C-alpha cells in the first residue's frame, strides 16, 4: 500500500492485520479438553492467532460435591497435583505453559496414563515433563501443598466469570466472547481446523448466540 504524506513524501506500507486473540482455559487431566487444545494447535498453523494458555481445575470445580461417585472423587484428588503445578508455571514461567501442556498432555492421553486416582498419582509424570521442557523439577513441590491454591482458584474463576459456573473444561474465549467447548472427538487438521475456527469466530461475534449441543455417539481418538 502506498501513502502520500502532506510533505509529498511517498512511503510504502504493508497492510497490517490483527491476530485473533484466543484464551484457552484447560485442565490437563481432561481428555476432551486435550482434543480441543490440539485443534487449537492445528489452527495456529493455518490462521493468525495469538493463544494464551490458562490453567483451570476440575478439582476446584467439583469441591464439596460429596454425592459424586467414590472413584470420580479419587480422580479429582489426583488432578490437584498437575493443576497446582500449572498454576505455579503460569505465575512464574508463563512462556512455558504451552510446552508443558503439550508434553504432559501427550504423556497422559496419548500415553494412556490418564484416569489416575489419589493424591500424588501424577507426580512422576509431572517431574518427567518439567525436565523435558526445561523447567525446574522443584516446581513439583507445589503439587502436594496448598501453596498456590489461591492462584489456581483465581485462574479458574477467570473462566467461570466468562461462562458461568456449571461448565467444565475447556473454556475458550475468542476475542471478548467465551464458551465452554467445543467438544470434539477427533483432532481437525490443516484447513479443516482453520475452517472450524472461522465458524467458531463467527458465532462468537453474534451477541445472542449461547449454545449448540448434541449427545456424543463415538469415543475419543488422540492421534
Where does each model-flagged region fall?
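Solvent-exposed beta-strand sheet faces enriched in polar/charged residues
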Residues: 23-25, 54, 173
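A broad structural signal for alpha-helix termini and local helix breaks/kinks
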Residues: 2, 47, 93, 133-134, ...
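Proline-centered helix-kink/hinge sites
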Residues: 31, 55, 169-170
Amino acid at each position: 500500500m502506498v501513502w502520500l504524506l502532506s510533505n509529498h513524501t511517498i512511503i510504502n506500507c504493508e497492510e497490517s492485520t490483527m491476530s485473533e486473540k484466543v484464551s484457552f482455559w484447560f485442565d490437563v487431566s481432561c481428555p476432551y479438553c486435550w482434543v480441543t487444545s490440539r485443534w487449537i494447535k492445528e489452527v495456529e498453523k493455518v490462521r493468525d492467532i495469538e493463544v494464551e494458555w490458562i490453567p483451570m481445575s476440575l478439582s476446584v470445580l467439583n469441591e464439596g460435591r460429596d454425592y459424586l461417585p467414590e472413584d470420580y472423587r479419587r480422580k479429582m484428588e489426583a488432578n490437584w497435583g498437575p493443576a497446582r503445578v500449572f498454576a505455579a508455571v503460569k505465575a512464574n514461567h508463563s512462556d512455558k505453559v504451552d510446552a508443558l501442556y503439550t508434553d504432559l498432555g501427550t504423556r497422559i492421553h496419548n500415553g494412556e496414563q490418564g484416569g489416575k486416582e489419589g493424591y500424588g498419582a501424577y507426580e512422576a509424570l509431572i517431574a518427567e515433563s518439567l525436565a523435558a521442557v526445561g523447567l525446574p523439577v522443584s516446581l513439583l513441590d507445589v503439587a502436594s501443598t496448598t501453596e498456590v491454591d489461591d492462584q489456581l482458584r483465581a485462574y479458574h474463576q477467570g473462566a467461570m466469570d466468562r461462562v458461568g459456573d456449571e461448565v467444565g473444561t475447556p473454556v475458550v474465549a475468542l476475542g471478548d466472547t467465551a464458551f465452554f467447548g467445543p467438544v470434539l472427538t477427533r483432532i481437525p487438521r490443516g484447513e479443516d481446523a482453520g475452517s472450524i475456527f472461522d465458524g467458531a469466530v463467527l458465532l462468537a461475534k453474534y451477541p445472542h448466540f449461547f449454545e449448540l449441543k448434541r449427545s456424543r455417539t463415538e469415543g475419543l481418538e488422540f492421534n
